[in-house]
Amino acid sequence: MNDLLKGSFELPRGQSSREGDVELGEQQGGDQGLEDFFKKVQVIDKQYDKLDKLLKKLQASHEESKSVTKAPAMKAIKKTMEKDVDEVGSIARFIKGKLEELDRENLANRQKPGCAKGSGVDRSRTATTLSLKKKLKDKMAEFQVLRENIQQEYRDVVDRRVYTVTGERADEDTIDELIETGNSEQIFQKAIQEQGRGQVMDTLAEIQERHDAVRDLEKKLLDLQQIFLDMAVLVDAQGEMLDNIESQVSSAVDHVQSGNTALQRAKSLQKNSRKWMCIAIIILLIVVAVIVVGVLKPWKNKSA
């Protein structure tokens, strides 16, 4: 029983599934349905690797976009980023579906002997699934940070473009209007008159293309926000449930340890009692022998 209780805590909460969950699967893979369970965990883990690569790719594309000054180049980057964000959404929804499937299987697995709610196997499955949910929530949060960075740096780029063309810093309301509408021709009217329409049109086209790119990317990235919120709710709810289970198991461990201590103490007392009983018997035998000798006085019989 101690081994079972101890085994249930081999997976620290919050540990990454690659370092914790899969390792636990290797240790207990053949136990009561865990082998198949951890194969599915590994499938999900590979999807997280894809999300990591896509996040880095999107971050690199975003950095590249900040130095682009031509509309065609901006359009090409936009196309690449939209494709990558679409793939992120597909993977995230796939993972979410697999996690929901694991939840259903975890409930069904409790019907097996030795796998009831709160058992070592059940806690291993629940903790691993919770870890995967937390990982998805954290990944979606990273993409939301990317969305916020794109929005903020888009504002900085537009501000620089206006200054480059007009030689003047635009106020916040002007920048807000540009970001909101993408219509910059009115703002650059003076520059068009001074420099000629042809020289300014490239900048106007690039700003419009950038506006469209940021708007479309933000919409797609916001779609991931719902997955983040769903995972946040599940992680909080299931985390609290797991805390309660672990608290109960911890209490059970304490009771078992207390019982073992009491048992050892009882054995020690029993051993000491036997020891003193033997000593008392020996003393009693000595006293009886002395009394018998004193009564019989065998040395007088010899003298007679």
UniProtKB/Swiss-Prot annotation:
**InterPro entries in UniProt:** SNARE (IPR010989), Syntaxin (IPR045242), Syntaxin/epimorphin_CS (IPR006012), Syntaxin_N (IPR006011), T_SNARE_dom (IPR000727)
Entry keyword annotation includes Cell membrane: yes
Q: What happens when the gene is disrupted?
A: Defect in cytokinesis in embryos and defect in seedling growth.
| SUPFAM superfamilies registered for this protein in UniProt | t-snare proteins (SSF47661)
Vesicular side of membrane: 297-304
Q: Which GO terms describe its cellular component?
A: plasma membrane
Q: Induction of this protein: by what?
A: Induced by auxin in roots. Down-regulated by auxin in shoots.
> What tissue specificity does the UniProt entry give?
Widely expressed in all tissues throughout plant development.
Q: Which PROSITE patterns match?
A: SYNTAXIN (PS00914), T_SNARE (PS50192)
What are the entry keywords?
Acetylation, Cell cycle, Cell division, Cell membrane, Coiled coil, Growth regulation, Membrane, Protein transport, Transmembrane, Transmembrane helix, Transport
A GO term, aspect molecular function: SNAP receptor activity
| Membrane topology label | Single-pass type IV membrane protein
All copies of domain t-SNARE coiled-coil homology, residue ranges: 204-266
Q: Where is region (Disordered) located?
A: 1-30
Q: Where are residues bearing N-acetylmethionine located in the sequence?
A: 1
Which residue ranges run through the membrane?
276-296
Q: Where in the cell is it found?
A: Cell membrane
Q: What else is known?
A: Plants silencing SYP132 exhibit reduced root hair length.
Q: What does this protein do?
A: Vesicle trafficking protein that functions in the secretory pathway. Acts in coordination with SYP123 to mediate tip-focused membrane trafficking for root hair tip growth. Functions in root hair elongation by forming SNARE complexes with VAMP721,VAMP722 or VAMP724. Involved in cytokinesis. Acts as a cell plate-specific syntaxin, required for the fusion of vesicles at the plane of cell division. Required for secretory trafficking to the plasma membrane during interphase.
Similarity field:
Belongs to the syntaxin family.
| PANTHER family documented for this protein | PROTEIN SSO1-RELATED (PTHR19957:SF307), SYNTAXIN (PTHR19957)
What is the name listed in the Swiss-Prot or TrEMBL entry for this protein? Syntaxin-132
Q: What is the organism field in this record?
A: Arabidopsis thaliana (Mouse-ear cress)
**Gene name?**
SYP132
